[in-house]
């Protein structure tokens, strides 16, 4: 994990940073306790609109709100974390595990006792 953290740190000045500020069922401090880094996509190190590649970082015990969007999306977990799709049960795909979200499907993610870090991609 140290190598991944160093790689992200080296890209930090070029990344587009953002936070989600709306959504239902997020933990009380989720706005302060999460950030997205855009590597490739609008505002990222490489600005393009056909694909987005970035990562999500959340503090321990943070629940990201239920949300949905038109593009399909894939995540690969670099740390422990859980996902929920379409109001179903929470599940942990495991470190190096992945998840795919269909277009417009409601989904959410949450961290446990450790920080959450995942790489994601949206096909726009």
Language model region names:
Residues 47-48, 53, 91:
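Short hydrophobic/aromatic segments of transmembrane alpha-helices and their interfaces
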Residues 38-40, 54-56, 75, 84, ...:
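Residues in well-ordered beta-strands of folded domains
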Residues 70, 104-124:
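Ligand-binding loop in jelly-roll beta-barrel domains
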Residues 1-49:
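A short, N-terminal "cap"/entry segment at the start of jelly-roll beta-barrel domains
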Residues 35-42, 51-69, 103-104:
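Conserved short histidine dyad/triad with adjacent acidic residue
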Residues 58-60, 65-95:
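A short beta-strand-loop-beta hairpin characteristic of the jelly-roll/cupin
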């Amino acid at each position: 994990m140290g190598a991944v953290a160093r790689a992200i740190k080296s890209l930090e000045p070029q990344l587009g940073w953002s936070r989600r500020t709306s959504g239902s069922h997020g933990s009380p401090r989720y706005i302060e306790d999460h950030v997205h880094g855009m590597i490739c996509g609008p505002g990222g190190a490489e600005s393009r609109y056909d694909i987005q590649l970035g990562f999500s970082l959340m503090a321990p015990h943070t629940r990201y709100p239920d949300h949905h969007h038109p593009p399909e999306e894939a995540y690969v977990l670099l740390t422990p974390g859980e996902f929920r799709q379409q109001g179903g049960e929470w599940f942990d795909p495991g470190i190096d595990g992945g998840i795919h979200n269909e277009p417009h499907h409601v989904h959410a993610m949450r961290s446990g006792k450790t920080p959450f870090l995942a790489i994601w991609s949206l096909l726009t």
